[in-house]
């Protein structure tokens, strides 16, 4: 049986990256519930500096709880979304929750695409997360 809960402020934000954290921050005191695998927002434009050693890796992340103080953070993974019943199923370390919402924001991020350029796969470097830096 799933534990049911309501999204804070009626808004469920799926993803804690640039878009998701910005929406939650804009909602201000109204609040929101953020579902994210990480408890931080990664500032990807600074990853090359972290990789080169000119910037410490801790300076390219912002804790979501600090950036969005009025938001509830669910560290977990979205496993189902039903727009008809306005519910989302979220799997966390402590259990699986069914979250009811009035509005949802899908801000799940992107994936890197490697272009078909000769030699890129063998010699190119990509920066998508902190581990890459």
Positions of the model-derived regions?
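Beta1-alpha1 glycine-rich phosphate/pyrophosphate-binding loop at the start
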Residues: 2-74
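FAD-binding core/adjacent interface of flavoenzyme oxidoreductases
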Residues: 1-8, 72-133
């Amino acid at each position: 049986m799933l534990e049911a809960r309501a999204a804070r402020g009626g808004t469920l934000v799926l993803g804690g990256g640039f878009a998701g954290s910005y929406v939650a921050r804009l909602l201000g005191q109204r609040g929101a519930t953020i579902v994210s695998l990480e408890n931080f927002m990664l500032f990807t434009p600074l990853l090359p500096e972290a990789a080169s050693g000119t910037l410490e890796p801790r300076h390219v992340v912002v804790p979501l709880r600090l950036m969005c103080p009025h938001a509830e953070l669910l560290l977990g993974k979205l496993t189902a979304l039903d727009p008809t019943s306005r519910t989302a199923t979220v799997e966390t370390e402590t259990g699986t929750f069914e979250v009811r919402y009035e509005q949802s924001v899908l801000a799940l991020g992107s994936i890197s695409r490697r272009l078909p350029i000769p030699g890129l796969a063998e010699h190119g470097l990509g920066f998508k997360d902190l581990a890459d830096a």
